[in-house]
Amino acid sequence: MKINVVDHPLIKHKLTIMRKTDTGPKEFRELLKEITLLIAYEATRHLEIHETEIETPLEKTKGYFIDDKDVVIVPILRAGLGMSDGILQLLPNASVGHIGIYREPHTLEAVEYYAKLPKINENSFVFVLDPMLATGVSSVKALDIVKEHGAKNVILVTLIASPEGTRVVNDKHPDVIIYTASLDRELNSKGYILPGLGDAGDRLFRTK
């Protein structure tokens, strides 16, 4: 499977706190942002760097820069919103789009209800953000949408992934690289990841 689990002590520590039932929404939001930043450190290694000449206090030298104006961040509403600031802290000039998708509770099919994306071209580097890669149908739908808008270079950043969802994404979008903090055991009969952390959106926004 085309998936990179970012194995780091800080991520394991913070993710453990997020999983706990008694972790409140404020701490949950802060941890999601922090873990996303740590995952993004690895996920952004695919970005193209450009050579330039700079002047230090002592002499001229060669340097490098990333043109983050070519970067597009696309959180899947609503839980993906909690991941945006983590990447924007690293790439503050990136464009941000939004895709609204909900999972139909009976069929578990992905239904699009909103899509607002900035200009995307073949040189754009698109990060799709989805905290929980469960059945994979929402992520696949979002990947379909960004590719329909012209995206060629796409990375899926997720907090927790299931083996089932990872296989679905790999089958439908074999060119997309997945970065995650954890590959969990399995899905339950309702399509939730086990052991997981529950519904990320509900925990972020305290809607249950």
UniProtKB/Swiss-Prot annotation:
GO molecular function: GTP binding; magnesium ion binding; uracil phosphoribosyltransferase activity
Recorded metabolic or biological pathway in which this protein acts: Pyrimidine metabolism; UMP biosynthesis via salvage pathway; UMP from uracil: step 1/1
Regulation of catalytic or functional activity: Allosterically activated by GTP.
Record-linked SUPFAM superfamilies: PRTase-like
Cofactor binding, note field: Binds 1 Mg(2+) ion per subunit. The magnesium is bound as Mg-PRPP.
Keywords noted in UniProt: Allosteric enzyme, Glycosyltransferase, GTP-binding, Magnesium, Nucleotide-binding, Transferase
Cofactor(s), by name: Mg(2+)
Record: residues binding 5-phospho-alpha-D-ribose 1-diphosphate: 78, 103, 130-138, 199
Pfam families, per database record: UPRTase
UniProt EC number: 2.4.2.9
Entry binding sites for uracil: 193, 198-200
Domain of life of the organism encoding this protein: Bacteria
Function: Catalyzes the conversion of uracil and 5-phospho-alpha-D-ribose 1-diphosphate (PRPP) to UMP and diphosphate.
Entry's family note: Belongs to the UPRTase family.
Name of the featured protein: Uracil phosphoribosyltransferase
Species this protein is from: Thermosipho africanus (strain TCF52B)
Upper lineage: Bacteria, Thermotogati, Thermotogota, Thermotogae, Thermotogales
